[in-house]
A protein has these predicted regions:
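Hydrophobic structural segments
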Residues: 1-168
Length: 168
């Protein structure tokens, strides 16, 4: 029986410790995991864009691999008509409003979803705002099963077995 834990799937977990004991070079995750990166899209007035982006960056949005503060934005026209219970910051209740908005998209680690959503909720200027979160097919080079690396010198199978006995 082999019990696997989250530590088996981390770049700094059990497999990394084994690689370090064996003094392996050029180590990397053997089977990178999918579904650990999500994407947030929302729509915001251009005047509020930079503030919202910066707040979301501090919550973990906009990261992928070795990069942070990543986003994609495109301008468009948003329309809405608030009912009698609405509280629009732009436009009037009962009248259709057209406004230039920016569609902005961020990637983020799946485990930070609640933190990112809470930041969006607190900092989005609209009382009602549209957003979507989807899982991506990107693999995460730091999360996955197993690790692989290279030895300094080539060894026969018997030499390698003896090497493992000494190092472990």
């Amino acid at each position: 029986i082999s019990i696997h834990t989250a530590m088996d799937n981390s770049i700094v977990g059990v497999n990394k410790i084994i690689c370090d004991k064996l003094k392996l070079n050029k180590t990397r995750i053997l089977i990178p995991k999918k579904g650990t990166i999500k994407k947030l899209t929302t729509y915001v007035p251009e005047k509020n864009l930079e503030d919202l982006k910066n707040k979301l960056y501090t919550s973990g949005a906009g990261t992928i691999g070795n990069y942070d503060e990543c986003s994609f934005s495109v301008k468009g026209i948003g329309t809405f008509k608030g009912n009698s219970k609405s509280n629009p910051i732009i436009g009037k209740k009962g009248s259709q409003t057209k406004i230039e908005e920016v569609k902005v998209t961020f990637t983020f680690p799946a485990h930070k979803e609640q933190q990112v959503l809470q930041t969006l909720k607190i900092n989005h200027p609209y009382d009602e705002y549209a957003f979507e979160i989807i899982s991506t097919e990107n693999t995460n080079k730091d999360i996955g099963l197993g690790m692989i690396g290279e030895l300094d010198n080539e060894m026969s199978e018997n030499e390698f077995i003896n090497y493992i006995k000494i190092k472990m």
